[in-house]
Swiss-Prot record:
It catalyses: 2 (2E,6E,10E)-geranylgeranyl diphosphate = 15-cis-phytoene + 2 diphosphate. Pathway: Carotenoid biosynthesis; phytoene biosynthesis; all-trans-phytoene from geranylgeranyl diphosphate: step 1/1. It comes from the Eukaryota. GO terms for biological process: carotenoid biosynthetic process. Keywords: Carotenoid biosynthesis, Chloroplast, Isoprene biosynthesis, Plastid, Transferase, Transit peptide. Gene3D superfamilies: Farnesyl Diphosphate Synthase (1.10.600.10). Its main location: plastid. Belongs to the phytoene/squalene synthase family. Pfam families: SQS_PSY. This is Phytoene synthase, chloroplastic. One of its GO terms (cellular component) is chloroplast. InterPro entries: Isoprenoid_synthase_dom_sf (IPR008949), Squ/phyt_synthse (IPR002060), Squalene/phytoene_synthase_CS (IPR019845), Trans_IPPS_bact-type (IPR044843), Trans_IPPS_HH (IPR033904).
Length: 398
């Protein structure tokens, strides 16, 4: 999303308050060894080679998505322009027969249903999408609903009944909808979206792999492991969405840097979720904070389960928050590279999520018994600010 955003980031031994951080120097070799992660499927492109760092493996997915977009540009579909779309491969509005019109009406209803879900569960983001072109906002709604349904499998009311086989069936549905064979209306909306925009299936599969990790893994030894998990459950969303949101025609950024910045925003959001929900996760027996870093700080699992805020905990949290902000900073450099009609919802999401970190600090780092949130007044202030930032073209944001 920004020309000066490093195309990828490499781990190296540097500490901030006892926390491993990332370096944007691409020429430096990685000195961290990545622990082998044996996911249940064993087929994820991201986890295929355990020798490299998680970041390096995730970058392969970034390259693949960027290549798809470049290929689409060469085929003159013009995804970076806000050209009006009147149909898709799945359903053609121009068909004159009754069956064609019925299909078109059903598709419109499917997208409307997705919009209703987005409006109910992501109100601020939904308002931002209303500034997009009708075609783009409907596609973003469809992606949002699929991601929400996927997350609900392991984090919803029926999560205790979900098995690995259920996730396998969900992945089968994903494959089918990418082949133009949706199971229900929500799937139909996404099937139309992925047939219209150059969206790769891999980030969707990787998100399902993230749900598999949640079923069998509740602790992460290193930040490298946690980074991979954050990519699976949140970074993937950025890779799904950018092909729909589009890149500004005047942008001088490389396609890879646009997707890398989108990935950074997803990682930042998930790290923020983890820091906000420490107490809630602990009550479920889960600790997402890197075990190695906790050990270096002298913090045991029992300490977290007791939930007592001490100077030791405050110092540890300062480092964790600083790292999350680093990811937000990298993402922020690139939002202006998006299509002008797509910037506001992204800016709104970024600014609001950053304020959750501020709220943790305002709570004196008590994320055991207090849930950090952004109040309505601050949200109302953030929305105009997000809108004003969305007006700036790429060349003016450096």
């Amino acid at each position: 999303m920004a020309c000066n955003f490093a195309v990828r980031v490499i781990y190296y031994p540097k500490e901030i308050h006892g926390v491993s951080v990332l370096n944007t120097n691409r020429s430096r070799k990685s000195r961290f060894s990545c622990r082998v992660m044996k996911l249940s499927t064993g087929v994820s492109a991201v986890a295929a080679n355990p020798v490299r760092t998680s970041e390096e493996r995730v970058y392969e997915v970034v390259l693949k998505q960027a290549a798809l977009v470049r290929e689409e540009k060469r085929s003159s579909r013009g995804l970076c322009l806000d050209t009006k779309r009147t149909g898709s491969k799945s359903f053609d509005k121009s068909e004159n027969d009754d069956a064609g019109m019925k299909s078109w009406n059903l598709l419109n209803e499917a997208y409307d249903r997705c919009g209703e879900v987005c409006a109910e569960y992501a109100k601020t983001f939904y308002l931002g999408t209303l500034l997009m072109t009708p075609e783009r906002r409907r596609a973003v709604w469809a992606i949002y609903v699929w991601c929400r349904r996927t997350d609900e499998l392991v984090d919803g009311p029926n999560a205790s009944h979900i098995t690995p086989k259920a996730l396998d069936r969900w992945e089968k549905r994903l494959n089918d909808l990418f082949d133009g064979q949706p199971y229900d209306m929500y799937d139909a909306a996404l099937a139309d979206t992925v047939s219209t925009y150059p969206v790769d299936i891999q980030p969707f599969k990787d998100m399902i792999d993230g749900m598999r990790m949640d079923l069998k893994k509740s602790r992460y030894q290193t930040f490298d492991e946690l980074y991979l998990y954050c990519y699976y459950v949140a970074g993937t969303v950025g890779l799904m969405s950018v092909p729909v949101m589009g890149i500004a025609p005047e942008s001088k950024a490389t396609t890879e840097s646009v997707y890398s910045a989108a990935l950074a925003l997803g990682i930042a959001n998930q790290l923020t979720n983890i820091l906000r929900d420490v107490g809630e996760d602990a009550r479920r027996g889960r600790i997402y904070l890197p075990q190695e870093e906790l050990k270096l700080a002298g913090i045991t699992p029992e300490y977290i389960f007791k939930g007592k805020v001490t100077d030791k905990w405050r110092s540890f949290m300062k480092g964790q928050i600083k790292r999350a902000r680093m990811f937000f900073d990298e993402a922020e450099k690139g939002v202006a590279e998006l299509s002008s009609a797509s910037r506001w919802p992204v800016w709104a999401s970024l600014l609001l999520y950053k304020q959750i970190l501020d709220a943790i600090e305002a709570n004196d780092y008590d994320n055991f018994t207090k849930r950090a949130y952004v109040g309505k007044a601050k949200k109302l202030v953030s929305l105009p600010l997000a809108y004003s930032r969305a007006l700036f073209a790429p060349s003016t944001v450096r």
